[in-house]
Design a protein with these regions (language model features):
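Flexible, glycine-rich linker and terminal segments associated
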Residues: 320-322
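Transmembrane beta-barrel domains of Gram-negative outer membranes and organellar outer membranes
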Residues: 24-227, 236-300, 311
Length: 322
């Protein structure tokens, strides 16, 4: 009987600790723009201003279809892209947070053409010309002035460009405000679209704002400064800018719903290809389940203006806090 009585405080303590962890917000959903032509050019995540020590595994799968030609450019893409991203963050108290992102990529013919055909037919959405192509057949061919720029390699697994990050808080009391700087190293193969071939850099202002104890807003404003794209040809890229915002709301002690949107300009000079030139918009909806030492999240991303972004992105992520 005495042992049973002693168990009660222990169980209550564990329950309370789990409850505390459940209310520790972990930032926006770990999703970035997977448009294959843009992906190697230091694509930003929507980030939290708060710092942390953590390790994340993020698995994303997307589908892209582009069939456009202009006077000087050809962009023919019909593929699915899978990315496994290993993300590590280390908070050095009273100084800054340092981090590294290591992506592993695989472009494939995919398996989603038939489900997408059913989806478009059922709900009456346009299919962007998908019905003119054989189902689940790989194509990734980008040309400039008739010469290859990027030629994808089906089923090739390879590293993308590794990113190093540095985050510094400039305001620690709600709202939390930070400056984020990063450098992306040319570790990926640019000729097949897995890297840029140059060092890219970026800087952003991040903000977290609490609305009570169960809702948090996130906002980012940033600029990316890419080097030249050194693929089959070398071409100069433009600086591009992005803005994003999101919200997370706890609906249950261990569960939250998240919604976010990100808008970005194109890193390419004018090509005459609408899906490359126009502003990209990605909208993400998802959920997160908190555990004592981290969280799991699942999300779906859509491109409402069908430019500069995949048709959809499915993402599953796991984060462990230290």
């Amino acid at each position: 009987m005495k042992n049973r009585v002693c168990l009660v405080p222990a169980v209550l303590t564990i329950f309370l600790l789990c409850s505390v962890y459940a209310f520790a917000f972990e930032g926006p959903l770990q999703v970035k723009n997977q448009f294959p032509i843009f992906l190697p050019i230091n694509q930003p995540y929507l980030e939290q201003a708060s710092t942390e020590s953590s390790f994340s595994l993020s698995l994303s799968h997307s589908s892209v279809f582009v069939m456009e030609d202009s006077a000087h450019w050809t962009a023919h893409l019909d593929l699915e892209l899978t990315e496994l991203n290993l993300r590590c963050r280390k908070d050095i108290p009273d100084l800054f947070e340092v981090g590294v992102d290591i992506p592993v990529l695989r472009a494939t013919p995919g398996f989603m053409d038939r489900p997408l055909e059913w989806y478009h037919d059922t709900f009456g959405f346009p299919d962007y010309g998908r019905n003119t192509r054989p189902q689940n057949e790989f194509l990734y061919d980008v040309k400039k002035d008739g010469a290859p720029l990027i030629e994808g390699d089906s089923d090739r697994v390879g590293f993308g460009d590794v990113r190093l990050t540095l985050k510094k808080k400039i305001a620690s009391i709600d709202p939390v405000i930070s400056i984020l700087a990063d450098v992306e190293l040319p570790t990926g193969n640019a000729r097949i679209g897995y890297g840029s071939g140059s060092i890219d850099s970026a800087i952003a202002v991040l903000l977290d704002k609490d609305l009570g104890s169960e809702t948090r807003l996130y906002a980012n404003l940033g600029a990316v400064f890419p080097g030249d794209l050194k693929a089959h040809q070398t071409m100069k890229l433009d600086n591009f800018f992005y803005a994003g915002t999101g919200a997370e709301s706890l609906i249950w002690p261990h569960c939250s719903l998240l919604a976010q949107i990100m808008v970005q300009t194109s890193p390419f000079p004018h090509t005459g290809i609408s899906q490359i030139d126009n502003t990209a918009v990605i909208v993400t909806l998802g959920g997160r389940y908190y555990i004592a030492t981290g969280s799991f999240e699942l999300s779906l991303t859509e491109d409402p203006n069908t430019s500069g972004a995949p048709d959809f992105i499915l993402n599953f992520s796991y984060k462990k806090r230290f």
